Regions:
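Glycine-aromatic-enriched surface loops/turns that form tight recognition elements
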Residues: 10-101, 105-256, 262-382
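Sec-dependent, cleavable N-terminal signal peptides
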Residues: 1-12
Length: 382
């Protein structure tokens, strides 16, 4: 298997982040020409080019990711239960290999591309490279929506969603999101079923190697990225967050940027949550501001902006991706609860009047803060 290999000063990068694929530039409501340094909206996703997706179709039902070293199943079969996905992987000899597994949420998220676009419940352009991967939609003939096409990961949420559901994280490559999905479908009184794609290879992928540099920064030598150790305790809209990171000077470095969606998701710690560890879903080497939820309850943690626009809805350029390091809360049946799980990836409007937020949106009443927090990133020099 061919794999590109990168090194830092301390060794091989084992967790290379695949770029989002974004090449267009956006304001709060339009496609724009590429901003220059000092311009409004400079520093967004397309400003910086990372490890570009590079796949090989092996002609045997498998796809090699030449960046991550992971080997993937090309096709998706029928929807299946969480347990059935493990049985399928254990019994598979696809491509002549017998060490297939259910991917972790970080492995699975390595495949997402934010060149996709969704239109509410209808699919548009998928958030995965369809030149290599077959991605099914929800079956509208049985009452599903096209976006009901979620993919299981092996990552079990350490908390619970919906006031008691055992929850598994998954990626939706039709609408471009991570959330926690119930293991059991209460309405059908049966195990929940979702799509599934097997993986093998690079068992170090998704494992961080954090070092506290003692100067307000944290290096992850698995990804080759250096992070701002502590947020500054302030919420900002998207444009202001881009500018904050671009102008940040910290530990003698001035090349900080707002991380893209895949970079920021790489530092989520899915073994932690407010419910179970009384902490954000991030390694305690980082410092994270505690906030109150929209009802004034303490013990929550912010959503953090990324530089990535999320193309969704009638005004597709108006929202950007965030990662929830606290609970992914929503208000359902007039009750505020964790509906998506700490570590979910959703999107917020890029801008709005402060006195109108937080508010609630969509069928699960997603909390919208708009004024989200920032943790800046830079690339470690090789």
């Amino acid at each position: 298997m061919c794999m590109a290999v990168w090194y830092t000063a301390v060794g091989q990068i084992t967790y290379p982040i695949v770029d989002t694929g974004v090449t267009e530039f956006y304001s709060n409501n339009n496609v724009i020409s590429a901003p220059q340094s000092g311009d409004d909206f400079y520093g967004q996703d397309a400003t910086y080019t990372g490890n570009q997706p590079l796949y090989t179709d092996n002609g045997d039902g498998t796809i090699t990711d030449n960046v991550t070293g992971l080997l993937w199943e090309k096709d998706m079969g029928e929807k299946m239960s969480f347990e059935a996905s493990f049985a399928k992987a254990q019994n598979s000899n696809l491509g002549g290999y017998s060490d297939w597994r259910v991917p972790t949420i970080k492995e699975l998220y390595s495949l997402i591309l934010f060149t996709g676009q969704v239109k509410g419940a209808k699919s548009g352009k998928l958030f995965i490279d369809t030149h290599y991967f077959n991605q099914l939609l929800g079956d509208t003939t049985i009452g599903e929506r096209e976006i009901d096409a979620q993919t299981w990961s092996s990552t079990v949420y350490v908390g619970q969603t919906m006031n008691g559901d055992k929850t598994i994280f998954g990626v939706n490559f039709v609408d471009g999101r991570i959330k926690g999905y119930p293991k059991f479908n209460k309405r059908k009184n049966s195990e929940n079923t979702m799509y599934f794609r097997m993986v093998r290879g690079n068992t170090d992928y998704g494992k961080n190697n954090f070092i506290d540099n003692g100067d307000g920064t944290v290096s992850d030598y698995a990804t080759g990225l250096m992070w701002q150790k502590a947020d500054d305790g302030k919420g900002r809209d998207w444009e202001a967050s881009l500018a904050y990171s671009e102008h940040l000077e910290l530990a003698g470095y001035s090349d900080w940027r707002l991380p893209n969606a895949k970079e920021l998701q790489s530092i989520v710690d899915y073994s932690r949550s407010p419910q179970t560890t009384n902490s954000p879903a991030i390694n305690p080497v980082f410092s994270t501001s505690e906030i109150k939820d929209p009802e004034g309850n303490s013990g929550q943690y912010p959503f953090f902006w990324t530089s990535t626009t999320h193309l969704d809805g009638v005004n597709p350029t108006s929202s950007a991706v965030y990662i929830a390091f606290g609970e992914g809360q929503g208000k359902m049946r007039n009750q505020l609860m964790d509906v998506h799980g700490a570590g979910c990836q959703r999107s917020d409007p890029k801008s709005g009047s402060k006195n109108k937020y937080p508010t609630y949106f969509g069928p699960q009443g997603d909390v919208r803060y708009v004024y989200n927090y920032v943790r800046s990133v830079r690339t470690i020099e090789m």
